[in-house]
């Protein structure tokens, strides 16, 4: 048979939802026969995966792996928590994390084109086979961050939340490991949007001040107070905003007195170790955050089954 045309490839892509190169290969392998090409893709699990890819994947695993001075925080989503807890998914996630550590991809698409760690196939091919032939659910490599330096991590509840912390210190990584993990746990628990007050955008702070002043103007108790007192109260409210929204100014969750901030904890531990520690970066992933998850009720499920 002659060369496969672009029109034929587009037709197969439209009918199956499979990518261009896979459709081209399927047509070439079957002498341009469209029906056989579709069957070929189904046998490979590609057509099945294409149909599944439209379904919301909001469950899954967040994992963190640190090897020496290189670490990765990775989120892989599945449709159900049952699938996320299978050995197949866990092994895949670990292999992908190690691929990121060793090969340093620029983004998810670059990652998919790489040979998976410990195997011979690409990450994309392994993902397709896993989704189409084994798990039979939509599986999505959603995001990752690769960091270098003195790192610590914390994974909450088997992969529902993951945090990676980068520290600047002259102390060895093993000496500051517990401190870094404690900071990561703090982030996991209270999810501060900023590390320190300097990180709060000027427009966000200005808006917060406007809200504070508006609240004070509506409070009848404030009308009789001197301007100096009002200013002090407003400053106190801004300080409270910082203590709630800036990680290092939050009350340290492990301190039972409620008087020690996260920064105070880090400084005290650094002094005890004879060095300095600065929290440089904190990345927090929460499984499925921002992914729209359709909630089906029982009646809908029964109706779907009856209409099949």
Specify the residue positions occupied by each region the protein language model found.
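N-terminal assembly/interaction segments in proteins that build large macromolecular machines
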Residues: 2-308
């Amino acid at each position: 048979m002659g060369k496969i045309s672009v029109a034929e490839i587009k037709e197969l892509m439209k009918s199956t939802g499979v990518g261009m190169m896979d459709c081209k290969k399927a047509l070439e392998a079957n002498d341009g026969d469209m029906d056989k090409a579709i069957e070929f893709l189904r046998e490979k699990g590609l057509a099945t995966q294409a149909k599944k890819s439209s379904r919301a994947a909001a469950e899954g695993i967040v994992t963190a792996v640190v090897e020496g001075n290189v670490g990765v925080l990775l989120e892989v989503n599945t449709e159900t928590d049952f699938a996320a807890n299978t050995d197949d998914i866990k092994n895949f996630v670990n292999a992908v994390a190690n691929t990121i550590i060793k090969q340093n991809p620029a983004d998810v698409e670059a990652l998919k084109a790489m040979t998976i760690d410990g195997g011979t196939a690409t990450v994309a091919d392994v993902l397709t086979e896993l989704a189409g032939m084994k798990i039979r659910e939509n599986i999505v490599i959603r995001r990752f961050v690769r960091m270098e330096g003195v790192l610590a991590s914390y994974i909450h509840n088997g992969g529902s939340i993951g945090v990676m912390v980068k520290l600047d210190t002259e102390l060895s990584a093993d000496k500051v490991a517990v401190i870094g993990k404690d900071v990561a746990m703090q982030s996991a628990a209270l999810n501060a949007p900023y590390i320190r007050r300097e990180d709060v955008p000027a427009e966000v702070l200005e808006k917060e001040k406007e809200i504070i002043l508006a609240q004070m103007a509506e409070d009848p108790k404030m009308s009789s107070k001197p301007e100096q007192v009002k200013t002090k109260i407003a400053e106190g409210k801004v300080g409270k905003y910082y203590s709630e929204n800036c990680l290092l100014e939050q009350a340290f969750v492990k301190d039972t007195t409620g008087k020690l901030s996260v920064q105070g904890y880090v400084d005290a531990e650094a002094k005890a170790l004879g060095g300095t520690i600065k929290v440089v970066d904190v990345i927090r992933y929460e499984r499925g955050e921002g992914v729209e998850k359709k909630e089906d009720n029982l009646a809908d499920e029964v109706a779907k089954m009856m209409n099949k």
